[in-house]
């Protein structure tokens, strides 16, 4: 998903329409569910919805760690900047845990949604 979002970002940049990372995540989640008329069942974390999701480490690689340290040092540690980093630099190494239908199917037994330590 991250690579697809990154490629979409590049194409939109070339066309003069920069897509914010939050918009890209929306399009991959609730936006897609709405387009398929499935938003009453999937695409969000509302109670009663089917829940397939991942837990991510924003700083899984050395380049990502440097980027996160840079953002923190300049007080730019926002969800938009974290997601932009995943959108442009993310890959499978950022996936800590995977949940399908609310049940953990991948990752350590202690996947407790902690932020990556730096």
Predicted feature residues:
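C-terminal cap of metal-dependent C-N hydrolases
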Residues: 51-109
